[in-house]
Regions:
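Adenosine-phosphate binding glycine-rich loop
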Residues: 36, 40-127
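Rossmann-like adenosine-cofactor binding region
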Residues: 1-65
Length: 127
C-alpha cells in the first residue's frame, strides 16, 4: 500500500500536482492542505473519501475551496466508531481530508519540544 501525505500551503486557486491515474489501487492519501495538490479527478477516483469535519468542509466549500471535490462518504468519526466501514478491500483507494485535527498539532509539538530540550533552548512558560 502506498501512503501519500500532502502538506504544502493551502491555496485558494490551486494548481494541483497529483492528477487522474496517479494514485494506485490500495493507496491511502491524507491531504493536510485542503485540495491544493490533488485535482478533482484524483479525488473522484477514491473509493472512499472522508474528512474529520463534514460541517467545516461544507463551510470551506462555500468559501470557494474544494470546488472539484466530490461529496464525502463519511466523516472519520463515523468510520472510527464503526458506524460506517472503512477500507473493505486491499484495492480500495481511500482519501482523508484533514481540515484541522488536533492530533497533528500534538505530534508536531512533541517533536519541537524534544528538539528544544536536546539543544538546551526554549523558554518555560508558567501555565
Amino acid at each position: 500500500m502506498d501512503i501519500i501525505v500532502t502538506s504544502g500551503p493551502i491555496l485558494k486557486d490551486p494548481n494541483p500536482a497529483i492528477g487522474s491515474g496517479w494514485i494506485s489501487e490500495g493507496s491511502f492519501v491524507c491531504t493536510l492542505d485542503f485540495d491544493s495538490y490533488l485535482d478533482g479527478e484524483a479525488f473522484r477516483e477514491a473509493d472512499k473519501l472522508a474528512t474529520d469535519d463534514l460541517g467545516q468542509l461544507g463551510f470551506y466549500r462555500e468559501e470557494g475551496y474544494f470546488g472539484g471535490t466530490p461529496e464525502c462518504y463519511a466523516d472519520l468519526g463515523e468510520i472510527a466508531s464503526g458506524n460506517k466501514p472503512g477500507r473493505e478491500s486491499e484495492r480500495e483507494r481511500t482519501i482523508a481530508i484533514n481540515l484541522g485535527l488536533g492530533l497533528e498539532d500534538m505530534a508536531t509539538a512533541i517533536r519541537v519540544y524534544q528538539s528544544a530540550m536536546d539543544q538546551g533552548i526554549g523558554t518555560k512558560l508558567p501555565l
